A protein has these predicted regions:
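FIC/Doc superfamily catalytic core
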Residues: 1-240
Length: 240
C-alpha cells in the first residue's frame, strides 16, 4: 500500500488535486518544520510559526529559529533529493538545521569531538541512551553511506525500511552535539523522496510521530535493550 499510494503515478489520477498541489505542499512543509522542532523543545505556537514562515519574517528567538531552520532544510532536501548519501550531505543538512541555535556556533555542521553527550528522559532526566564514542563517528558514517549507496546489494531491503534504518542509526550514533533527532528525521524524509515516494512531500512525518512520541521513544529503547533488534523501530514506523 505504501508503494501504491506514496510512490504511485503523479499524473491525472493522482490523489492530490492538481489545482491545490502548491497549497498542500506549502502547508505540509510548514507543518513538518513546526512539529519536528516542537518535538525538540521549540515553544512557539503553530499560529505564530506559520505567520513567520508565510510572511518570511526574521525569527525572534531560538524556538522560531529552530522552526525557520527546519523549513529551510526541508526545501534544501527537496532540491537535493537525487544526491547520493554522503558525509557532506549529512553535515550540510545538520548545518542548516542548527544555524544560530547552537551554544557553540562552530558545532553546526560538524561531528561532536567528545563523549559529553547522553540521551535523557525529558521528565525524569534518567539516561536512556549513551551513544558510541565520538572517535567511531567518521568511520560509522562512511560505512553507512557505502551501504546505502551500494547499487548491487547482496540482499534486497525495501526502500521504506532502508529509510527507517537511516533514521534509527543516525539517532543511535548521535553524531552531533545537538539537533540529532531533527537531522535523523530529515534524512528519513530525504531518503523517501530520493526513492520516489513523492507523497512524502505532502505529509508531515513529524506530526504523525509527535502524536505517538512515547511509542517513538520506546521503539528506540526496546531496540537497544533487545540486542539491537531494529524490528521494534521498523514496526513502529510502519504502524503509524
Amino acid at each position: 500500500l505504501i508503494d501504491l499510494y506514496w510512490g504511485g503515478s503523479q499524473g491525472s489520477n493522482s490523489i492530490i488535486d492538481a489545482n491545490n498541489k502548491e497549497q498542500y505542499l506549502d502547508s505540509s512543509l510548514i507543518e513538518e518544520a513546526i512539529f519536528s522542532s516542537q518535538m525538540e523543545g521549540a515553544a512557539t505556537t503553530r499560529r505564530v510559526a506559520k505567520e513567520m514562515l508565510q510572511k518570511k519574517m526574521t525569527p525572534r528567538d531560538k524556538s522560531q529559529q529552530m522552526i525557520h531552520n527546519n523549513y529551510q532544510t526541508i526545501q534544501y532536501i527537496v532540491d537535493h533529493k537525487d544526491a547520493s548519501l554522503s558525509t557532506h550531505l549529512l553535515l550540510q543538512i545538520h548545518r542548516l538545521m542548527t544555524n544560530n541555535t547552537m551554544a557553540n556556533p562552530e558545532d553546526a555542521g560538524r561531528f561532536r569531538s567528545n563523549d559529553d553527550v547522553v540521551v535523557e528522559n525529558g521528565i525524569t532526566h534518567e539516561t536512556v541512551h549513551t551513544p558510541p564514542s565520538y572517535k567511531e563517528i567518521p568511520q560509522f558514517i562512511d560505512d553507512l553511506c557505502a551501504f546505502f549507496n551500494d547499487k548491487n546489494p547482496q540482499q534486497f531491503i525495501h526502500p521504506v525500511i532502508r529509510g527507517i534504518v537511516i533514521h534509527f542509526m543516525i539517532s543511535f550514533v548521535h553524531p552531533f552535539v545537538d539537533g540529532n533527532g531533527r537531522t535523523a528525521r530529515a534524512m528519513f524524509f530525504w531518503y523517501m523522496l530520493k526513492e520516489g515516494y513523492w507523497l512524502t512531500e505532502y505529509l508531515s512525518i513529524s506530526r504523525v510521530i509527535a502524536r505517538s512520541k512515547k511509542a517513538y521513544e520506546k521503539a528506540f529503547l526496546y531496540t537497544e535493550i533487545d540486542g539491537m533488534d531494529i524490528g521494534y523501530f521498523v514496526a513502529y514506523h510502519l504502524k503509524v
